[in-house]
Every structure is written in C-alpha cells, then in structure tokens.
UniProtKB/Swiss-Prot annotation:
Protein's UniProt name: Insect toxin TbIT-1
Chief place where the protein resides: secreted
UniProt superkingdom: Eukaryota
Entry annotated with the keyword Protein transport: no
Compartment annotation: Secreted
Keyword Disulfide bond: yes
Length: 63
C-alpha cells in the first residue's frame, strides 16, 4: 500500500485539529489503511490501498 494524507469528499485533508487520540487511526482504518495518526493538524495514514485518494499539492481541489 501507500501512505499519505487521506482526503474527504471535498478533496480536503481530514483534520484532527479538535479530535481525541485514536481518531485518525480509526479514520484511516475506515479507508482500509493499516494504521494512522494525527500529523497535526491533519490525519496521516499508512498502508492505504492504491485506490484511495490522498492529498496532493499539485492536484489539490480543496476549497
């Protein structure tokens, strides 16, 4: 798999600015990642399937 910042439906990073411990690990696992953590202020995932979109500065569509 790959690693990176998962994105929401708007193409924005998943924020962990106000979330508790374990939030990003849960969010990443919902996206079939092996694990994740809060790379404050956004979630970062490890072991993502190649089909899952991750944040890319070049093609960022976040509004």
């Amino acid at each position: 798999g790959k690693e990176g910042y998962p994105v929401d439906s708007r193409g924005c990073k998943v924020t962990c600015f106000f979330t508790g411990a374990g939030y990003c690990d849960k969010e990443c696992k919902l996206k079939k990642a092996s694990s994740g953590y809060c790379a404050w202020p956004a979630c970062y995932c490890y072991g993502l399937p190649d089909s899952v979109p991750v944040y890319d500065n070049a093609s960022n569509k976040c509004b």
